[in-house]
Amino acid sequence: MRSENVRHLAISEKEKIVGLLSIKDFANYYNFKFCAVINETDRVSRYAEEEILKIDCEATALHAAEIMCDHNVGSILVEKENDIVGIVTERGFSQRVVADGLDANNVKLSSIMNKPVLLDGHLPMDEALSCMRKNNVRHVVVTEDNKISGVISIKDLTIYCKHKFVYELDFGEPI
């Protein structure tokens, strides 16, 4: 999934598709199977993407999509007068622009953004998935001392789980 940059895999049996596996399925499996193994170093801020992409709320959806593609990310924070006022994600773009047949070059981000979900960076990683599930989102804005310090995605969480529980538990070596 990671090497192909996809979030869903078709499961086949005898050349027939029998199911669909999502990155969210992996995160749920690892989180609830091994949550007792989380230690002090497994804090959200350690694994959050620190490069914070921002764009003005009056920019177009097309411009935001271009920036997200250029940086290979699934979200961008939206600001107004240097304050973060929203977040635009791939899912939001597809649901509010593409599915509605709108021209991305004429859609302002202020009309498609969501209110960002915030999570304290000092919390353990299992709280990140709980927060995502509770709010039905795949991207959470990480804060430290009431300031935005990064963004963590379901993809980041899955990569963390893979390293933590596949490598560390199988080989006894820390990540």
Positions of predicted regions on the chain:
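Short N-terminal micro-motifs specific to bacterial/archaeal maturation
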Residues: 17, 52-55, 84-85, 103, ...
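Bateman (tandem CBS) regulatory domains
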Residues: 39-52, 106-116
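Residues in well-ordered alpha-helical elements
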Residues: 24, 62, 91, 110, ...
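Short beta->alpha transition motifs characteristic of CBS
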Residues: 6-10, 17-32, 73-77, 84-99, ...
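Juxtadomain coupling helices with adjacent low-complexity linkers
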Residues: 25, 30-43, 53, 127, ...
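Conserved small-residue-rich
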Residues: 42-102
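The conserved cystathionine-beta-synthase
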Residues: 1-5, 12-13, 54-72, 79, ...
